[in-house]
């Protein structure tokens, strides 16, 4: 069953032709976020080539594998890459899709928000940066996690994936979402808090903490800083308030100064809550 969870106030977007998409992520090609996004993109009529890491590569940024990468075809335009998200994008554009280049690279949907200074280490965002560096428009998308759900598998995030994916599938039809020299970084709140879209500046803070704890003998892990601090209008704060945040990023990771590209058209999108409820089924 198809779900259209948004209505863009111009008819141009939904009337636009389907796109040829390179879909990737940093959680791995079988992760629930990318699988939900692939299903939504196909249902929206787009042509999708899923080219993503075979294993979780979270935190890899734009790093690449210098010793070469292997890839496996799984049929139905799905390939897994023994490398990082940037490897997958480079391999996709330069080799797998060489004769059928993508109109856009879509990266996500990440299991966890990519806001503030954490975009620097994000493989999800790094894949979008890599695409734009190679001259292909891109968009990155992530779904919020509630740290209180850590012991139960983050069910709110799992139910966010389907409706967020359907929204991305419609949003990218609008050519205004496909920028040159920069890209949109989207973060989706969990459904219960959903208020709509909001253009945001990149927060100066990071979720990543430097408070390391020993989790096993000789193995240390840093925790997370869940308090966003006092940063009004930042992506981190607005996401916590229930907005789908939109941040325009340059390919050297600097936030594009606001006001920049007019993104008010995205803020004017209305979301049908009944369609969101109907789509909120974990994949």
Task: Mark where each language-model region is.
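Bacterial N-terminal signal peptides
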Residues: 1-11
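Boundary at the C-terminal end of the N-terminal hydrophobic targeting segment
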Residues: 13-15
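A cross-family phosphate/adenosyl-ligand binding-site feature
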Residues: 17, 21, 35-94, 100
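Alpha-helix C-terminal capping segments
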Residues: 94-99, 126-137
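Conserved acidic residues
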Residues: 103-104
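Charged helix-capping and loop-helix junction motifs
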Residues: 120-126
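Glycine-rich phosphate/pyrophosphate-binding loops
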Residues: 132-156
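Electrostatically charged, flexible surface regions
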Residues: 157-282
């Amino acid at each position: 069953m198809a779900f259209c969870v948004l209505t863009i106030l111009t008819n141009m977007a939904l009337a636009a032709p389907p796109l040829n998409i390179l879909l990737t992520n940093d959680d791995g090609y079988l992760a629930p976020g990318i699988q939900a996004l692939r299903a939504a993109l196909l249902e929206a009529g787009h042509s999708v080539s899923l080219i993503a890491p075979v294993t979780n590569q979270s935190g890899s940024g734009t790093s690449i594998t210098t010793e070469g990468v292997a890839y496996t075809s799984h049929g139905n335009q799905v390939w897994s890459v023994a490398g990082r998200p940037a490897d997958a994008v480079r391999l996709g554009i330069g080799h797998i899709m060489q004769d059928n280049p993508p109109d856009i690279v879509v990266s996500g949907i990440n299991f966890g928000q990519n806001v503030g200074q954490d975009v620097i280490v994000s493989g999800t965002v790094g894949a979008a940066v890599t695409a734009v560096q190679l001259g292909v428009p891109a968009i990155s998308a992530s779904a919020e996690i509630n740290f209180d759900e850590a012991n139960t598998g983050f069910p709110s995030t799992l139910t966010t994936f389907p409706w967020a994916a359907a929204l991305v599938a419609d949003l990218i039809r609008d050519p205004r979402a496909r920028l040159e020299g920069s890209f949109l970084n989207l973060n989706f709140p969990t459904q219960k808090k959903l208020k709509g879209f909001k253009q945001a500046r990149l927060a100066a803070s990071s979720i990543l903490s430097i408070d390391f704890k020993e989790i096993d003998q000789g193995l240390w892990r840093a925790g997370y800083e869940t308090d966003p601090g006092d940063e009004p209008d930042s992506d981190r704060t607005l996401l916590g308030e229930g907005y789908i945040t939109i941040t325009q990023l340059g390919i050297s990771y600097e936030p594009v100064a606001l006001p920049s590209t007019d993104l008010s058209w995205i803020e004017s999108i209305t979301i049908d809550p009944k369609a969101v409820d109907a789509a909120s089924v974990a994949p």
